[in-house]
Regions:
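H-loop/switch region of ABC-family ATPase nucleotide-binding domains
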Residues: 184
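P-loop NTPase motor domains
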Residues: 1-178
């Protein structure tokens, strides 16, 4: 959903990206059995690592290997992700987390009103995913979505996805003794 919030990727694009993300984590030694509590931010790959892996796959593409994706599909993914991973928008997305304490976190989203749709949608989705994880995995957490209209983006696809995430959070937070508060003008 994060990549779809950024660009209008088809299901085929997302499926290929998921394969590449799995390979990237495997390359970094991260699996379902990894003890994430011992990992530092630098122990995780960043988006440029994903881009490099996809580019490597594209450059060495072997049509006879019966891949689940085509070279053309990889090229389209590279074009769609370039700005986020290597270009002008990489400053927003391509880096390790700078959250050093999780006791009280404020994400100021007012400045996102001036950002282009793809950046705004992806950044809001990133924040919502982080909040969802804290609310539903850690539990005993309160999150506030202020300026709700910003979250309900003018991009129909992103807005619908965000609404679904909010709805799913609201259905499950009580079981984790968490709260989601929404406000707007």
């Amino acid at each position: 959903d994060f990549f779809r919030a950024y660009k209008d990727f088809s299901d085929r694009h997302i499926d290929a990206i998921e394969i590449m993300v799995s390979r990237l984590y495997e390359k970094w030694g991260i699996s379902d059995t990894t003890d994430f509590g011992h990992l530092k931010p630098e122990d995780y790959p960043i988006l440029s690592d994903l881009y490099d892996l996809i580019e490597e796959e594209y450059q060495g593409y072997d049509a006879d290997a019966h891949q689940l994706y085509t070279a053309e599909l990889l090229q389209e993914i590279l074009l769609g992700l370039h700005s986020m991973c290597k270009g002008a928008e990489a400053k927003f997305f391509n880096g390790h987390t700078n959250v050093t304490s999780s006791r009280f976190i404020v994400f100021g989203v007012k400045g996102l009103l001036q950002a282009n749709r793809s950046v705004r949608g992806a950044m809001l989705f990133n924040i919502l995913s982080f909040m969802s994880d804290r609310l539903l995995t850690i539990g005993n957490t309160t999150a506030v979505l202020d300026e709700l209209y910003v979250w309900l983006s003018d991009n129909i696809t992103v807005g619908t996805t965000i609404i679904e995430y909010i709805r799913n959070i609201l259905k499950r937070v009580r079981k984790k003794e968490s709260n989601l508060i929404m406000a707007s003008q």
